[in-house]
Amino acid sequence: MDDAPITPLAVPSEARTLIVFGGTFDPPHWGHVKPVVEARVLSGLHDAWLVYVPAARSPHKSSGPVFPDARRVELLRLALAEIDHAAIWTDELERGGGAATYTIDTLRRLRRLRPGAALRLLIGADQALALHRWREPREIVALAPPLIMLRGGVETTREKLTAALGATGAWSASE
């Protein structure tokens, strides 16, 4: 378990649901904002807080971000300025030191920080289909049941996506 100090999260302690959305945000753009806000609405979690988690370096990419961490955070802050119930949690940047960070570790740390909150992980369909290659995918699903958003370039229907997810072994039919 990661014993590094946990970065505070600028979300009210009474927030009951946190939708976690991670990425390199290199640089952040409207495609990192609009679909996430829409996913909150479509999921019916209107009062949930959107927690953006900039990655130090994605374990799924061969190189680190082009933009420096501080610049990515500042640009993300500007992109989210008009979005209600949205926060940036820099825990991965502060503990990563430029190394790859893993979603499971981030979710465990967030659970320690907010033990009473319901956690949901927002991921694109492309990432959902690759979840079986992530570190400890079954625990990820247990800690933060995913919300899956369709993205450009991923041609699928709900039925095809459900079947493909089940075939990966990271998901069960009930999830």
Positions of PLM-derived features:
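Nucleotidyltransferase catalytic core that binds NTPs
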Residues: 1-175
